[in-house]
Amino acid sequence: EQIARGRHIANSFCASCHSTTNELPLTGGLDLGKDFPMPLGTFVSANLTPAGPLKDWSDGEIFRAIRNGIDRDGNVLFAMAGARGRNLSDADIEAVIAYLRSQPAVVNDTPLPLDQYGPLALILVGAGMIPEPEPPTDAAIAMPAKGATAEFGAYILSYQDCVLCHGADLTGGEPGQLAPVGPSLAVVRGWTMEQFITTLRTGVDPSGHALNNQLMPWQNIGRMDDDELAATYAYLTGLPSLVAQQPK
């Protein structure tokens, strides 16, 4: 059951970065730097199968990388430090680790170091113009009871990377942010729950607009089960910042 839970999270979350096909296995090789609005360097996702570097890491070191974006040598992992996976519950991170250990080893050599900062990135870091990662934490995180509730939806939104594109309050991203600028999610309040789930399962919204998976990873998010998607809908439709906006 733990491995199955970890596989589910890997398939609906981790694979959007750690796979060039958006699918399992998590062989890495995707240059996340190509999605940035400016040339900051190359930031290649690691091969997370037992053929990759994690075979030499302890479970605790993998846990720290997910929770705090720090590798076994104490170096900051640029993409992981800014990602939301740090908000996965302790039990869910342990489930992901159990799944990672269970994967078949698939060879996919990736460049080392994975993070290679370009000149512009070094200038921006030196000038304090790239946001600092959140400070490391060892605080425990518990997952609320699973169900089609806004509370469980809040947990899902805490670790899915929606805010990176759609803004801290999900009312729309800001020009100049590192992630693609996403629109306000107030539009969801004009959809039924069935339309919301269908959009994330098919990549086509109720107006017939096709979502670009490179900008909006609906293929991965749509692999969440019905309760998870219903919980996400319940959370979004009741979020005060979105209630204050009219659906467009």
Residue locations for each model-derived region?
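The canonical Cys-X-X-Cys-His
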Residues: 6, 13-21, 62, 96, ...
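Short flexible/disordered coil segments
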Residues: 136-152, 170-174, 184, 228-229, ...
